[in-house]
Amino acid sequence: MNRRRRIYEGKAKILYEGPEPGTLIQFFKDDATAFNKKKHDVIDGKGVLNNRISEYIFTHLNKIGIPTHFIRRLNMREQLIKEVEIIPLEIVVRNVAAGSLSKRLGIEEGTVLPRSIIEFYYKADALDDPMVSEEHITAFGWASPQELDDIMALAIRINDFLSGLFLGVGIQLVDFKIECGRLYEGDMMRIILADEISPDSCRLWDIETKEKMDKDRFRRDMGGLVEAYQEVARRLGIINENEPPRGSGPVLVK
């Protein structure tokens, strides 16, 4: 690992130079962060679960024609991805009031929204990722109007797919965050899904009990994060049904 050239290190992942031009290796760390790194811990086994859950989701998105950077999983913690030019925005899709939306607008957590809402946040840790409007995005050149249309169309399709996927295993998709990038292929450029989709980037509640099965368990000091992520993976059929929840080294289905 040390011999490879490190391209970028974020809060939960490291990007290394890939084996072929136009590819990168995405490594999933066990680091858990919240509130823009103000809260930090290392949780054994988290990266392995996020790698597998994100692989599962991106593979299904690719199959239904939603373009992503995912090529294939390499091992327990790494996947091969296409190199993209990341658009400096976090795109949040909300179906149920929770988190900052509840605080900002005084809406009780758990309130189903009249329709899905798409929000944009400028990726800048020093500024705590401020919420921005479409006007800000186009005025400052972070994305063009056409790119924004493409991003929103992707976000809506991803929301439709994920909502159905999770509903089928007894999980409510409250909200989720995605990132997109520009993929250059010869003279052509298109917007594709990048980063990851995992319980780190989604709010997932058990439909029956409303039990939180996502990173809010870390944000709110609830404990049981790995067990919750394992339960998500188990329901999706990613890890062995008979494997008891435990803090490290989950047995994975090949």
Curated annotation (Swiss-Prot):
It comes from the Bacteria. One of its GO terms (cellular component) is cytosol. Keywords: ATP-binding, Ligase, Nucleotide-binding, Purine biosynthesis. Pathway: Purine metabolism; IMP biosynthesis via de novo pathway; 5-amino-1-(5-phospho-D-ribosyl)imidazole-4-carboxamide from 5-amino-1-(5-phospho-D-ribosyl)imidazole-4-carboxylate: step 1/2. Its EC number is 6.3.2.6. One of its GO terms (biological process) is cobalamin biosynthetic process. The keyword ATP-binding applies. It holds the Pfam family SAICAR_synt. It catalyses: 5-amino-1-(5-phospho-D-ribosyl)imidazole-4-carboxylate + L-aspartate + ATP = (2S)-2-[5-amino-1-(5-phospho-beta-D-ribosyl)imidazole-4-carboxamido]succinate + ADP + phosphate + 2 H(+). GO terms for molecular function: ATP binding; phosphoribosylaminoimidazolesuccinocarboxamide synthase activity. Transmembrane segments: none annotated. InterPro entries: SAICAR_synt/ADE2_N, SAICAR_synt_PurC, SAICAR_synth, SAICAR_synthetase, SAICAR_synthetase_CS. NCBIfam families: purC. Belongs to the SAICAR synthetase family. This is Phosphoribosylaminoimidazole-succinocarboxamide synthase.
